[in-house]
């Protein structure tokens, strides 16, 4: 192209505009011919692709962190403090839905700051199951030992260990069938001796898992003086494996040791449908005391030490007086997780 000509149309001109265009081509928004760019090498293309993958992974991590922060639970703190640290913008419909779930503080008719809020905790069902087991087993063993000493019963505590042999099938009813046969043997012997009239078939047991995740049971059994049970596997009462029985020195400490081994991990791995513990033979007063200790601390304080506490919808009540204690805690299930919350004063 000769000098003094338009770079697009090739017509001679005196005035040039950006891109070497004449007045006519500039006014018509003429397309500027661009120089061809060199082809990008394979190494550079691979580098760009890796950078893109890294950026995408970083963004996914940021999104996951944002979700975790958004769903972070409030433990032991007021909702006002949580909202101040993690403000969330909600629509009016969203605010009503969150209010119904107890996840935000309740507003009063006054336009000033609210004086109430909620405390929310997450409940681990497996951990709660392990805690109930420890409380039931240790308290039941203590009450049995107190009854035996208070009533001046003659006898001794024996430890019975039950295991399954390799290849043997296990069933949730195996332990129940064993105690059914042992109780029948106990009652037959009791009916033939007058000195055993006041005796009861007392036992407390707790489950455990072996290294192969097979159930394994430890039983504390009260044997009156002169009564004989023998080995339950040789009598055919436990045909699933072997048994071992020996005299005990510290019945409460023995069961407390095995109850403390039962954790949330054990509860998760325990076969479905199998019971994990049991207690039998307590008198009426000891049963009432066991239920009292298994009730929440707030219910025990509200209803008193002599109450026969029973569970009712929305709280607990004393069966002796009919007094009802409404629980301040409400339970909500969100995406398979269990949350308990209550309204508190800020």
Swiss-Prot record:
<dbReference type="InterPro" id="IPR056906">
    <property type="entry name" value="ORF2/G2P_dom"/>
</dbReference>
<keyword id="KW-0255">Endonuclease</keyword>
<keyword id="KW-0540">Nuclease</keyword>
<comment type="similarity">
    <text>Belongs to the inovirus G2P protein family.</text>
</comment>
<dbReference type="GO" id="GO:0003910">
    <property type="term" value="F:DNA ligase (ATP) activity"/>
</dbReference>
<dbReference type="GO" id="GO:0003677">
    <property type="term" value="F:DNA binding"/>
</dbReference>
<keyword id="KW-0436">Ligase</keyword>
<dbReference type="GO" id="GO:0006260">
    <property type="term" value="P:DNA replication"/>
</dbReference>
<dbReference type="GO" id="GO:0004519">
    <property type="term" value="F:endonuclease activity"/>
</dbReference>
<dbReference type="Pfam" id="PF23343">
    <property type="entry name" value="REP_ORF2-G2P"/>
</dbReference>
<protein>
    <recommendedName>
        <fullName>Replication-associated protein G2P</fullName>
        <ecNumber>3.1.21.-</ecNumber>
        <ecNumber>6.5.1.1</ecNumber>
    </recommendedName>
</protein>
<comment type="function">
    <text>Isoform G10P protein binds to double-stranded DNA and prevents hydrolysis by nucleases. Additionally, G10P is an inhibitor of DNA replication and may have a role in the transition from semiconservative replicative form DNA replication to single-stranded DNA synthesis in the life cycle.</text>
</comment>
<keyword id="KW-0238">DNA-binding</keyword>
<keyword id="KW-0378">Hydrolase</keyword>
<comment type="function">
    <text>Isoform G2P plays an essential role in viral DNA replication. Binds the origin of replication and cleaves the dsDNA replicative form I (RFI) and becomes covalently bound to it via phosphotyrosine bond, generating the dsDNA replicative form II (RFII). In turn, viral DNA replication initiates at the 3'-OH of the cleavage site. After one round of rolling circle synthesis, protein G2P is linked to the newly synthesized ssDNA and joins the ends of the displaced strand to generate a circular single-stranded molecule ready to be packed into a virion.</text>
</comment>
<keyword id="KW-0235">DNA replication</keyword>
């Amino acid at each position: 192209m000769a000098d003094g000509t338009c770079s697009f149309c090739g017509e001679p001109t005196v005035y040039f505009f950006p891109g070497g265009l004449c007045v006519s081509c500039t006014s018509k928004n003429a397309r500027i011919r661009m120089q061809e760019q060199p082809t990008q090498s394979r190494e550079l293309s691979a580098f760009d692709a890796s950078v893109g993958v890294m950026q995408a992974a970083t963004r996914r991590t940021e999104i996951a962190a944002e979700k975790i922060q958004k769903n972070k639970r409030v433990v032991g703190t007021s909702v006002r403090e949580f909202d101040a640290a993690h403000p969330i913008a909600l629509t009016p419909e969203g605010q009503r839905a969150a209010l119904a779930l107890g996840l935000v503080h309740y507003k009063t008719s006054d336009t000033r700051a609210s004086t109430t809020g909620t405390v929310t905790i997450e409940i681990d069902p497996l951990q709660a199951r392990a805690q109930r087991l420890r409380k039931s087993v240790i308290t039941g063993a203590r009450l049995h030992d107190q009854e035996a000493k208070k009533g001046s019963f003659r006898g001794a505590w024996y430890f019975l260990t039950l295991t399954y042999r390799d290849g043997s099938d296990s069933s949730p009813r195996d332990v129940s069938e064993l105690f059914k046969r042992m109780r029948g043997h106990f009652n037959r012997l009791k009916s033939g001796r007058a000195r055993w009239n006041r005796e009861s078939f007392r036992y407390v047991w707790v489950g455990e898992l072996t290294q192969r995740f097979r159930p394994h049971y430890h039983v504390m059994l009260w044997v009156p003086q002169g009564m004989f049970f023998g080995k339950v596997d040789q009598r055919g009462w436990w045909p699933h494996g072997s048994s071992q029985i020996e005299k005990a020195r510290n019945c409460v400490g023995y069961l407390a040791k095995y109850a403390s081994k039962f954790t949330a991990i054990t509860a998760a791995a325990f076969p479905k449908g199998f019971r994990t513990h049991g207690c039998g033979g307590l008198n009426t007063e000891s049963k009432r005391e066991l239920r009292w200790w298994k009730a929440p601390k707030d219910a025990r304080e509200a209803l008193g030490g002599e109450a026969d506490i029973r569970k009712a919808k929305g709280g607990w009540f004393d069966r002796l007086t009919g007094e009802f204690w409404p629980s301040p805690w409400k339970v909500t299930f969100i995406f398979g997780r269990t949350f308990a919350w209550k309204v508190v004063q800020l």
